[in-house]
Each structure stands twice: as structure tokens, then as C-alpha cells.
Amino acid sequence: MKESLAISSSKVLLVPYEKRHVNTYHEWMKSKEIQKVTASEPLTLKEEYLMQESWRHDHDKLTFIICRPTSTPITKVMAGTHDANRLLLGDINLFLFAAQDYNNCCIGELELMVAPLHARRQGYGRAALLCFLYYIQTHLDELMTEYCGSKNSKSKTMHLLYLRVKIHSENTNSIKLFESIGFRKVSDTADFFGELEFKLENCTEPETTTELLEKFGIEAYTKLPCIEEVSTGGFNDEQNNHSTAISD
């Protein structure tokens, strides 16, 4: 599942998190407001590059950078063009971990961030979330197989028990967004970081997600190859720890 694959729709474009995105991501995470609502500590640029490597290649993680949608239909995503810095909006992630007290089961934690203030409450977060959720549901067997190959899994088969998200109690927009697609609050009591947990049961079938995509006018869901135009380099060329959601 770590191939260079993008997800295109009428409302948003999702591309794999690559080294060329790290500088922009690093600038986003300097925001005190983002640090608060994502329960994050700022990382150095070098640490961000190491984190990108982890999110891109670890078997228990899946991440995409959220971009503005293309203005015309495309058949492939050109790296550095369709995901140029000016088009980047945030990120969306899935982290899998073993479920306690359940054999051969795991839980998926979602993380969503729309970083620029001007891009929030424009529908980008909802579009990214629904496209990402549909991707997970329609590639679940591959994701579970890959997770079984991670160092955190001791099983040869795996079942996704449910999806969860942690949202700062003051982040009412994100709470409304996740509740609007079926997530339900686990407890009214926030944790040490001021976060509330929300859970999506029955998360493995795409039918409900398909209905929500239609309801919110998110059309033309398509998987596209990402084509590298040039070598992007790494930390020496250019010189997250976040756990929750900022959205529309």
C-alpha cells in the first residue's frame, strides 16, 4: 500500500507524503494554535524528515497530504506540479495498533489537519476524510496484510475493530465534522491533553461512505499514479507527532 498512488476527487486531491512536502509541513507545525489542538510538540526540521520517513514507509501507518483539487481531469499526478507548495492544505493519516483483549484485531486512529486558516470550513476536511475512509474500506485486505508484516503485529491475520479519532474539546468544528459522518463520542471527559475520543463502529463497509460522498457532492473519486518529475532530495538538500484533528 506504499506505492506512489494519489486519490483525486472533485473537492480534494490526496498525495503520498514525500520529502518535498516536509518544509511546508514543518512551517505549519510552528503554529501554537495547531500545536494545541493536535497535542503536538514542535520538531526540528531534521526530526520532521525522520517522521516523514516513518509515516511513508512503516507498515502500521498510512498518510496523505491534502491538496486543492485539479481544475481539469487528469490521468496522473505530476510530483511538484499538482502538489506544489501553494496547493497544499494539510494532511490525513491512519495509524494501526493492536486492540487489547481482542485476538487478531487492531484499531485504526485517524488524524486530520487542514492547516491554513483561509482553507478551513471550505469542505476540504470533509472531502479528504471521506475519500480517505473510502480508500481504507476498499483496500482493507491489503492494509491488514501489510499491518501483519509490521513489528507491532504478532498475527498472520487481522481484523479492523473500529476507527477512532481524538479531538480537542474546544475544536467544535472538527467534532461536528466527525459526528456528521457517524463518529460517536466515547466519553464526555477529556484526557490529559484536553482531547475527547470519538469512535466509528461498523467502519469496514464502503456503502455508507459512498452515500456520504454523494450527499456532500464529492464526485469523481479516482486513484491515480504519482509520477516523479525530478529528484526531490532530502534533509541535506533543503535544510508529528500530532494526534488529532483540525478541519473544516
Task: Report residues per predicted region.
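Active-site rim helix/loop that mediates acceptor-substrate recognition in acyltransferases
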Residues: E41-T81
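Generic structural signal for well-ordered secondary structure
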Residues: E18, E27, E41-L45
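A short gly/proline-enriched turn/hairpin at secondary-structure junctions
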Residues: I34-E41
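Generic structural signal for individual residues within well-ordered alpha-helical segments
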Residues: N23-H26, Q35, Y49
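Acyl-donor (CoA/ACP) binding surface of acyl/acetyltransferases
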Residues: K2-L13, Y17, H21, W28, ...
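ATP/adenylate-binding site constellation spanning eukaryotic-like Ser/Thr protein kinases
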Residues: S31
